[in-house]
């Protein structure tokens, strides 16, 4: 059996950091994740997904992410229940994050950075040397930016 979730979205409000009686940090936040299609009116819809993260990553989330920050979450789905104030059973489904990636740099105003946000250049090439991939990290961290230059793709290299 497998219970694995990977999400990318924006925080709907600042994370809430609390500590258990044993002193363990826990942060909760809601991630707005766009659906991959538009509705009948041509509008992009989003799902609002509750997330929880524990220990040191919880403190990092609280310190570096804020409302509107772009984040990637890798974790699992968990359903729990409790008795509400009115005596009715309340069910909560949330994502327990095993890791949270900060997908924007501080320069973009998001308040966080990725763990691999160096200003380096990486070159990759395949065995037959017919094509190569060059990723240049620009100042804004967009590794896909090419300053409007045409992309050189050999049709023989496409899988379709």
Swiss-Prot record:
Homotetramer. Pfam families: SSB. This is Single-stranded DNA-binding protein 3. GO terms for biological process: DNA replication. Residues 2-104 form the SSB domain. GO terms for cellular component: nucleoid. Keywords: DNA-binding. Disulfide bonds: none annotated. It comes from the Bacteria. It comes from Listeria innocua serovar 6a (strain ATCC BAA-680 / CLIP 11262). InterPro entries: NA-bd_OB-fold, Primosome_PriB/ssb, ssDNA-bd. GO terms for molecular function: single-stranded DNA binding. Residues 106-160 are annotated as: Disordered. Residues 106-133 have a biased composition (Polar residues). The gene is ssb3.
């Amino acid at each position: 059996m497998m219970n694995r979730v990977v999400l990318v979205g924006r925080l709907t409000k600042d994370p809430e950091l609390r500590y258990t009686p044993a002193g363990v940090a826990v942060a909760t936040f809601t991630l707005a994740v766009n659906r991959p299609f538009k509705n009948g009116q041509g509008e992009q819809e989003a799902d609002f997904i509750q997330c929880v993260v524990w220990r040191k990553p919880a403190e990092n989330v609280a310190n570096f992410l804020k409302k509107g920050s772009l984040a990637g979450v890798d974790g699992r789905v968990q359903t729990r229940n409790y008795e509400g104030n009115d005596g009715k059973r309340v069910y909560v489904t949330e994502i327990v994050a095993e890791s949270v990636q900060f997908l924007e740099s501080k320069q973009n105003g998001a308040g966080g950075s990725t763990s691999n946000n160096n200003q380096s250049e990486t070159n990759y090439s395949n065995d037959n040397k017919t094509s190569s991939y060059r990723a240049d990290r620009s100042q804004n961290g967009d590794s896909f930016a090419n300053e409007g230059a045409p992309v050189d793709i050999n049709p023989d290299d496409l899988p379709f």
